Amino acid sequence: MLACIACSTKDGGEGGHRSATATPNSGKSLTSQLKDMVLKFSGSGRHQYKSGGSPSLRTSRFHRSSRLAAYPGIIDESGFTSDGAGEAYTYMRTTTASAGARAAPSTWDLPPKVNHRSFQPRVIRSPSASGVPSIGEEDYDDDDDDDDEETVLLEEDRVPREWTAQVEPGVQITFVSIPGGAGNDLKRIRFSREMFNKWEAQRWWGENYDRVVELYNVQTFSRQQGFSTPTSSVDEAMQRDSFYSRVGSTRESPAMMMPPPPPLPSSGAGREHPISRTASSKAQLSSSSSVAAARPPFYPSTAVPDPSDHVWAHHFNLLNSAAAGPAAPYDPSRGTTSSRDEASVSISNASDLEATEWVEQDEPGVSITIREFGDGTRELRRVRFSRERFGEERAKVWWEQNRDRIHAQYL
């Protein structure tokens, strides 16, 4: 029994020794096999990377190039191509649209799209770019960019744009484009002092009004009419002389259109006529005759009126009408054509021949023009302020403070 155990132990020990001696050789062979396998797998991976590249790498590279496609002056990777034979990528700076279109499907291996439109490369230029075009990669990216561009253009169309045109030497007209492309809004006219004086400027505007309206598609006049002071200190006086608006258009002055025929007495009561100055007070006929004899006679003016009167005529019309109270009954025998500037006399009846007009200097820099009719009715024709002493705002304040006194003293 003991002998058998000893034999088995001896045999086991010998076997263990043999296995121990054989283990280093087998370990070496296993290590070398594993190393060979690792080398084989690593070599095949490098070859596969050179030939095709992994999908995840292609995806990340594609997104990075998509983000940088809008900045061609910095980095432009959208034009490089691969020969597919394991060589390095070629960096192309001079890429044409046709070459990019042929290289894009083979480079990116994009899946076919369901839409019916073919791939159309689009050249994208950045204002800060160096002039090298970059080609858009995907169709839906181009669609998104086009939608963004169309939205920006629509936003620009909704904003009124101010622009200036030089009609002829010495004449500049400022327009404001009406949103929607409906036309232009006439805002300001500037005349050169070296080529035009006040009278020539107004005469030019009266002669060329229709041509300017037709040529520049003028639909409306600027709503900024009235008494806004120009911002330029150099052209301040010229701005005030040549600032024409709907209130003071020369086209509506008596010098530019014929007066209408006198109304009939039967239809005079129901006749609607433009804004006219109303009589604020009446004097006795005898006293008015003596006053009229002391005044110098008025002579009709045939020259073009002062353009500066355009700004104030309508304003004084409204103030005079408000201060005069209820209007006097309309007398058909004294019907005249009324315009907003009324720089010349319009006569519709022989009774108006007896009217006289004179100028009173209320204070230095303030001249008041008064008209008196044969029946003693007076009206305030014009109040003129010197540009050396009064600005527009100061003139308005002065008139508000002295309006009642002027009416009581002169009318």
Curated annotation (Swiss-Prot):
Pfam families: BRX. PROSITE patterns: BRX. Residues 20-31 have a biased composition (Polar residues). Belongs to the BRX family. It is found in: Nucleus. This is Protein Brevis radix-like 2. Residues 10-31, 103-149, 245-294, 324-346 are annotated as: Disordered. It comes from the Eukaryota. Residues 136-149 have a biased composition (Acidic residues). Keywords: Nucleus, Repeat. Residues 276-294 have a biased composition (Low complexity). GO terms for cellular component: nucleus. InterPro entries: Brevis_radix_dom, BRX-like. Its main location: nucleus. Residues 161-217, 356-411 form the BRX domain.
